[in-house]
């Protein structure tokens, strides 16, 4: 049973730091604890655990533009991150894993801001039949991490420039159809902002469990070897 909630927001826009921090939060989740982690990456392609980078993105273009490529711990497809995207992570003991419940927190937060979204399939959220959020999960020891992207105002030109669309998708749907399936929330809700979304997510997180979301206890968790472990995890995503 969840008895304590934490909320953490990253001040870094560097993908290796953020993915390392997410892994640290997941690894250091105690019994009955749950952490909401909110973070953003600047000009980054994130590929799934088993993906071939050369097949999923145009590495030459990404490198030429000073972008970053990282491999996350979860499976799923390649995604493009910039500062128009918000990443949401739920770090929790495996015994308390509740993907539908955590997804509902995101939907509730969006509803607070006037956005009525719905689930599509196993891993997506959409509005009017167009996807703005993808989800994935990984498990690490006794802990679980469910993370999601939320496209608020992502640069669509960069997304199309760096990501390779599957030939099968192009063959079956066509370029225009593939583009039309993805939407920025700002296209429908131009006044929506990242800070407002972060506040709504923290409020919905707290309301879902009837508990206050405390600031993450960094001083306590980084004591002893904690700081070295965090740096080690961040370095792993840099290589």
Locate predicted features:
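Short acidic (Asp/Glu) patches
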Residues: 55-56, 65-75, 101-106, 110-113, ...
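Short, conserved charged micro-motifs
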Residues: 55-57, 96-101, 158, 193-196
